[in-house]
A protein has these predicted regions:
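Active-site beta->alpha loop and helix N-cap motifs at the rims of alpha/beta catalytic domains
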Residues: 1-7, 11-118
Length: 118
């Protein structure tokens, strides 16, 4: 079995709450240079819920461009809005993300059928 190792990436913010891309790049380099096969950007550990839609697009686009095939990029594309989730997922794949990961609906009671349909 050929296992792959992925690291969920924390999102680094500047004092003004913008994304600190210099820190992000340093973190990408660190994990990829130390045996990790790929990253998960914009997931739960990356505070996806704190990013507006444009910030999420920029975070994904920057990660794909910066990593430039040195590792696998999985983009967290879950949003509270179904259409935003679909659009962000399509955006990530078109930008070159290797895969997307989508969190199911949260903070609301959903049946298994509701989650499946989502």
């Amino acid at each position: 079995m050929n296992s792959k190792y992925f690291c969920p990436i924390l999102t680094s913010f500047n004092d003004d709450s913008t994304i600190n891309y210099d820190d992000m790049h340093s973190l990408y380099d660190h994990v990829l240079e130390n045996g990790i096969d790929g990253i998960l950007v914009g997931g739960s550990a990356g505070e996806f819920y704190a990013l507006d839609y444009n910030e999420a697009e920029q975070l994904i686009s920057d990660a794909v461009q910066y990593i430039n095939h040195r590792g696998i990029v999985i983009a967290g594309t879950g949003r509270m809005n179904r259409l935003e989730t679909i659009n962000l997922s399509n955006f990530a794949l078109k930008k070159g993300a290797d895969a997307v990961i989508i969190v199911g609906p949260y903070y609301s009671a959903c049946s298994q059928e509701d989650v499946f349909n989502y």
